[in-house]
């Protein structure tokens, strides 16, 4: 689930955030204002995030964390009911109604790199944001590979814009 898109659906419910970096820290802080309980489940041995996030998390009263966890399964019939994981080989179960995965991601830009398209310093495809065109005339890009919000809704809009631009390019 998307924290900002779906977080409000979990008002006064227990949720889990699976992750380890700034994204997980921001998700915990955001959800702590909505959910009854926020449990961070991390494969790392500690939360590695900006100090300002770590300080704010320390003051939360509805937060708990489990580190060094290996996620085994998310269970539920029609809705999420629990997260199953292992810590040091010991199986554990946590009852939650929502799960937000914040493990970080890196879009696959291999084809763009192979084509020789210009890339940003962050490793994304460099585009003209007005028409989604890349550094190669007639080649357009959209979605996570171009950076930005990393949201499905914005990717759909950018994809539509890229499609229209491609049609205009083709005449």
Model regions and ranges:
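Cofactor-binding loop segments of dinucleotide-utilizing enzymes, especially the Rossmann-like FAD-
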Residues: 20, 43, 144
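A conserved FAD-binding loop/helix module that cradles the flavin
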Residues: 25-29, 142-171
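Phosphate-coordination loops involved in phosphoryl transfer and adenosine-cofactor binding
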Residues: 11-13, 68, 136
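A Rossmann-like FAD-binding core segment of flavoenzymes
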Residues: 32-129, 170-171
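Glycine-rich dinucleotide-binding loop and its adjacent helix/turn
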Residues: 1-22, 26-34, 125-129
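FAD-site-proximal beta/loop scaffold in flavoenzymes
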Residues: 1-9, 103-151, 161
């Amino acid at each position: 689930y998307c924290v900002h898109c779906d977080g409000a659906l979990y008002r006064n419910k227990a949720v889990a955030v699976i992750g380890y970096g700034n994204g997980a820290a921001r998700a915990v802080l955001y959800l702590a204002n909505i959910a009854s309980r926020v449990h961070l489940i991390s494969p790392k041995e500690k939360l590695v995030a900006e100090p300002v996030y770590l300080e704010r998390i320390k003051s939360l009263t509805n937060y708990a964390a489990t580190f060094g966890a290996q996620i085994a399964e998310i269970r539920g019939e029609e809705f999420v009911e629990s997260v199953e994981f292992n810590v040091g080989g010991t199986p554990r179960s946590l009852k939650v109604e929502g799960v937000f995965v914040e493990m970080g991601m890196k879009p696959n830009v291999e084809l763009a790199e192979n084509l020789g398209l210009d890339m940003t310093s962050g490793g994304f495809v460099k585009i003209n944001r007005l028409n989604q065109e890349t550094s190669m005339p007639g080649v357009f890009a959209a979605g996570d590979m171009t950076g930005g919000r990393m949201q499905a809704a914005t990717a759909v809009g950018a994809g539509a814009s890229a499609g229209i631009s491609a049609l205009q390019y083709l005449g």
